[in-house]
């Protein structure tokens, strides 16, 4: 199988640039419980540094995604990091953590930030909307430093003016 060849080659390869590398085999299987179970058992037996859960967050209902996370995480070693690939909404991250996921990656927070969309506790807001034009309250009074010192009106202005700083502030906020 490919994974066996991958692990063999990985173990034979010296770390690049003096940094230790880690291998996280990916559990696939779409939304089929039997395929995910088979893949998770196969991957769990390999003793890798961590394990990845892939092939989710690509259009299936979120409840089905959450169910597949549970199916896989019941099998994967609890003492290894479990990484859910491509999942990035705040709600999905919290649900993943609740189901035993340790790591996430996704372009969504920065892509949405670059497009004036901010994740907030009240939902997603569009900073290009005129309603923020005269709102001098902080982007997020309970957020990071940049959220506290940046007003919604200022961020709205930056987006309307096409300033790159707007994208940076919004991306930092979303992360």
What are these regions (language model features)?
Residues 1-15, 130, 160:
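Non-catalytic, usually N-terminal nucleic-acid engagement modules in DNA/RNA processing proteins
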Residues 4, 44-45, 147-150:
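Long, hydrophilic "mature protein body" segments
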Residues 5, 42, 71, 154-157:
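Alpha-helical scaffold segments in soluble metabolic enzymes
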Residues 13, 18-139:
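Glycine-rich phosphate/ribose-binding loops and adjacent secondary-structure elements
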Residues 141-175:
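C-terminal extensions of enzymes
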